[in-house]
Regions:
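Helix-to-loop junction immediately C-terminal to a conserved catalytic motif
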Residues: 41
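ABC ATPase NBD Q-loop/coupling interface
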Residues: 50-67
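Conserved ABC ATPase "signature" region
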Residues: 104-122
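Conserved ABC ATPase signature
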Residues: 127-131, 135
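Catalytic Walker B motif of ABC-type/P-loop ATPase nucleotide-binding domains
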Residues: 152-155
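A short, surface-exposed alpha-helical micro-motif characterized by mixed small hydrophobic
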Residues: 194-196
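Conserved ABC ATPase "signature" C-loop
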Residues: 206-207
Length: 215
């Protein structure tokens, strides 16, 4: 039975995503953007409907659910608050280590991910807590990129950064997309960023997908 507090966070939301697309997602606070993102990489399980990755329901098998969390990378808003390791290198390596990769492959991924976001070799050996806010943001994004996800979902990746830092982060994200033919799904309140970068725009309102079109 329903309760007085029950709320449908997403209603009749259906769309397909192609490899290599850059998709902008916009909507007012409470429109369902964060809920949508967390469904796409298996953090939340839909009470109705399904999430398909390469045509397979990610909840049909525990192995597929686990794989989806590596293949669909999720960067929360202000991800720098989730840094915890003693060096930048170790923080970026955390995800690849959890994937069970060998040390040489982990090292390759860490250095490549650092390169994508503009982290230098010298910075890899310092504490992430000694870096500026913008640099911490880069480290946090690199930690997800190092898992080489097919789909990279980002919640306001440029929030709180100065104009130069904002532009750098967005360029880094697009460079990853082009290099790996990855799909980017980016939540943003900046219509100019979305219009400039996206191939496609999803607009959520009142828990429903109201627009799915080119910007």
């Amino acid at each position: 039975a329903g309760t007085p507090f029950e709320h449908v966070a997403l209603k009749d939301v259906s769309f397909c995503v192609e490899r290599g697309e850059f998709i902008g997602i916009i909507g007012h606070t409470g429109s369902g953007k964060s809920t949508l993102m967390q469904h796409l990489n298996g953090l939340l399980k839909p009470t109705d409907g399904s999430v398909l990755l390469d045509g397979q329901d990610i909840w049909s098998d525990k192995r597929l659910t686990k794989q989806s969390r590596f293949r669909v990378g999720l960067v929360f808003q202000y991800p720098e608050y989730q840094l915890f390791e003693e060096t930048v290198y170790k923080d970026i390596a955390f995800g690849p280590k959890n994937m069970g990769l060998d040390p040489a492959e982990i090292d390759r991924r860490v250095r490549e991910a650092a390169g994508f976001v503009g982290i230098t070799e010298q910075q890899l050996e310092v504490s992430p807590f000694d870096l500026s806010g913008g640099q911490k943001r880069r480290v946090a994004i690199a930690g997800v990129i190092a898992m080489e996800p097919d789909v990279l979902i980002l919640d306001e990746p440029a929030a709180g950064l100065d104009p130069e830092g904002r532009e750098d982060i967005l360029k880094n994200i697009d460079a990853y997309r082009k290099s790996k033919n990855a799909t980017i799904m980016m939540v943003s309140h900046s219509m100019s960023d979305v219009a400039r970068l996206s191939d496609r725009l999803l607009v959520l309102n009142g828990s429903e997908l109201v627009i799915d079109d080119t910007p």
